């Protein structure tokens, strides 16, 4: 393996790219094995591992691509450049964290930060990552290179001015962009477009340019109404910037996983590209996280190498192709290597790789795109026109993903059902069969069918208090709840309400929620045991209403073309005792059948079995509930006649304090 600066690549002035105009493109690459010294202190496995950049470099070499690029040596960032976006205290902390004087404190410091590990190689790697992006950006802005890819780690887009978080120590892209704008005015870079296609919102980058009209920040990410990392409202489409920077911050927040090429390209074609054309940047930075790639263990999305190559190719229309890619996330080694190769081939202006069969965006994707356009159109006239009905009705229904317990027979049945559902043909009102879920108008036929079936919805959390539950049925908001619920399509109240006790463990976890703010929310272990007892309030509602409650609980829209939980799924959990995971990786994605009451299935929704293990290990935090949330549970237990106030408080305290 050749190292950065060795003879594997061309030197400045040499080139072997395709012809662009009257000359050939010079594509820069930076890679340094030294950045692999940043690792977990105890050698434990971690998704942000050194092999992430090794496999990319090896892939580029094996494909003969790195040999056709200009390979630059890495460079350490200067403190004065880091302090363009970071506080002096933060820079000093990262600088000193790998010294022997900090050996005994390093783990304690990391434990106080959000999703950070530190070791003796962390400081040098962080300085090299930021400095290398600065160096590459300077070469591109000077015209010595046309574009380039900095294969660096640790990543940067989560790092804020005074805080390391989300695997990020310095905000590499923000440092480099600020360097060009503030330290090299002679280069004539006055407007910078930063595109962040990492599956997680670039919260750090957004905050650093929040009031700066020189930087247009565009982030497309899983958001799920603030439930996906980094949790909160920062990634919402209403966050558009402030003061002179108002309108220069654009978020495209997916409300579910499974988004793929069609969804991302729709966001490009109907938001990013028209705005970029108006903005007319001088340089483009790309926070190139590949964790939205297919098979990524953290992202849950389905972007292919072809999808990344097309997105990048569309951006090369602007800034005379002056694009600087900086690696962010991406945790499937095969996906990150293939996606990186596809992007470098585009930079060299090679022919794009063959793409997958044509597909349509999810119907939820069009809703997000329309909401973003409506919010931003006052700043960007190109977004003012409404999208055509014909366009937005080229869509795919929200996906349904089935999982099961470890029982192989049940797992086969679940997969078989998924296969059958994927082959369904849907008849539209005109009688035309639409294959592969390419439906036209939103169908309501499933609602009529599911409205005929009753189920018991068993609540163990805030929905035990009936006024709170009715928000999911009739819409509205109760005291302490920070969001307004849209309600169900059928707003009929529950036909009956009863209380039961079930042998499942109640616990509270997660850092915060959109509905209740900072503090844990209630979950039950999907598996029963002989020790624990959980009080649940059972509401008799229709299966149609249950779908709408399930959708709202998991941040999905209720006006879906297809049910999240249909009659086949009900039969599956009823007969086989399976667990159905509907919205992938959602907090309450598991539907569990607890038995029957008067021959009517009792259904509850909770976390997955794998999530329980993550709660136990500490990967997902156990947290006591917020006061308003706990009070809602207590009111439900008391007003429902289940417990006295003192008993209810003791019940909640026990669930909080008892180890999982």
Swiss-Prot record:
Residues 26-349 are annotated as: Histone deacetylase. Its cofactor is Zn(2+). The record marks 331 as: Polarizes the scissile carbonyl of the substrate. Expressed in stems, leaves, flowers, siliques and mature seeds. One of its GO terms (molecular function) is zinc ion binding. Binds 1 zinc ion per subunit. GO terms for biological process: flower development; negative regulation of gene expression, epigenetic; regulation of timing of transition from vegetative to reproductive phase. Zn(2+) binds at residues 198, 200, 291. Gene3D superfamilies: Gamma-glutamyl cyclotransferase-like (3.10.490.10), Histone deacetylase domain (3.40.800.20). It is found in: Nucleus; Cytoplasm. InterPro entries: HDAC_PDAC, His_deacetylse, His_deacetylse_dom, His_deacetylse_dom_sf, Ureohydrolase_dom_sf. It catalyses: N(6)-acetyl-L-lysyl-[histone] + H2O = L-lysyl-[histone] + acetate. Belongs to the histone deacetylase family. HD type 2 subfamily. This is Histone deacetylase 5.
């Amino acid at each position: 393996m050749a190292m950065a600066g060795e003879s594997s690549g061309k030197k400045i002035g040499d080139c072997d790219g395709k012809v662009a105009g009257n000359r050939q493109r010079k594509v820069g690459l930076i890679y340094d094995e030294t950045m692999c010294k940043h690792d977990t202190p105890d050698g434990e496995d971690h998704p942000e591992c050194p092999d992430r950049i090794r496999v990319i470099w090896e892939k580029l070499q094996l494909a003969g691509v790195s040999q056709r690029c200009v390979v630059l040596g890495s460079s350490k960032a200067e403190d004065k450049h880091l302090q363009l976006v970071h506080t002096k205290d933060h820079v000093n902390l990262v600088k000193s964290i790998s010294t022997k004087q900090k050996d005994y404190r390093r783990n304690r410091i990391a434990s106080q930060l959000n999703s950070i590990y530190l070791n003796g190689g962390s400081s040098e790697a962080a300085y090299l990552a930021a400095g290398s992006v600065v160096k590459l950006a300077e070469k591109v802005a000077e015209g010595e290179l046309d574009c380039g890819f900095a294969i660096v780690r640790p990543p940067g887009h989560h790092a804020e001015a005074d805080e390391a978080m989300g695997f990020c120590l310095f905000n590499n892209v923000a440092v480099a962009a600020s360097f060009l704008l503030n330290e090299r005015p002679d280069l004539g870079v006055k407007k910078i477009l930063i595109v962040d296609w990492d599956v997680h919102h670039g919260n750090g980058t957004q905050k650093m340019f929040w009031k700066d009209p020189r930087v247009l920040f565009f982030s497309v990410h899983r958001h799920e109404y603030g439930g996906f990392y980094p949790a909160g409202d920062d990634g919402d489409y209403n966050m558009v910037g402030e003061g002179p920077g108002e309108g220069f911050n654009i978020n495209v927040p997916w409300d579910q996983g499974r988004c793929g090429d069609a969804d991302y390209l729709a966001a490009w074609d109907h938001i990013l590209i028209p705005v970029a054309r108006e903005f007319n940047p001088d340089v483009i930075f790309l926070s190139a996280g590949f964790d939205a790639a297919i098979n990524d263990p953290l992202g849950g999305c389905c972007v292919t190498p072809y999808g990344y190559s097309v997105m990048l190719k569309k951006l090369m229309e602007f800034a005379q192709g002056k694009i600087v890619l900086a690696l962010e996330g991406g945790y499937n080694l095969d996906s990150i290597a293939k996606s990186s190769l596809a992007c470098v081939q585009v930079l060299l202006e090679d022919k794009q790789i063959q793409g997958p069969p044509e597909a349509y965006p999810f119907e939820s994707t069009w809703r997000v795109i329309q909401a973003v356009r409506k919010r931003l159109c006052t700043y960007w006239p190109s977004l003012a026109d409404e999208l055509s009905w014909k366009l937005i009705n080229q869509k795919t229904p929200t996906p349904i993903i089935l999982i099961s317990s470890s029982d192989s027979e049940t797992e086969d049945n679940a997969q078989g059902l998924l296969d059958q559902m994927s082959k369904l043909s849907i008849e539209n009102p005109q009688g035309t069969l639409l294959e592969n879920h390419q439906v036209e108008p939103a169908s309501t036929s499933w609602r009529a069918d599911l409205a005929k079936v009753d189920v018991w919805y068993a609540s163990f959390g805030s929905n035990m208090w009936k006024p709170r539950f009715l928000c999911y049925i009739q819409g509205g908001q109760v005291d302490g709840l920070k969001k307004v619920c849209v309600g169900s399509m059928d707003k009929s109240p529950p036909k009956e309400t009863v209380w039961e006790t079930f042998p499942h463990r109640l616990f509270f976890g997660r850092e915060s929620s959109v509905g209740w703010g900072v503090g844990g929310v209630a979950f039950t272990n999907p598996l029963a045991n002989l020790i624990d007892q959980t009080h649940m309030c059972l509401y008799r509602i229709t299966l149609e209403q249950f779908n709408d409650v399930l959708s709202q609980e998991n941040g999905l829209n209720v006006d879906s073309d297809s049910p999240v939980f249909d009659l086949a799924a009900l039969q599956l959990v009823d007969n086989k005792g399976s667990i159905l995971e509907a919205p992938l990786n959602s907090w309450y994605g598991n539907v569990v059948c607890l038995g029957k009451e008067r021959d009517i299935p009792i259904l509850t929704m909770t976390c997955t079995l794998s999530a329980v293990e993550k709660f136990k290990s500490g990967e997902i935090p156990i947290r006591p509930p917020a006061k308003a949330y706990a009070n809602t549970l207590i009111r439900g237990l008391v007003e429902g006649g289940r417990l006295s106030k003192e008993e209810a408080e003791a019940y909640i305290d026990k669930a909080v304090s008892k180890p999982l």
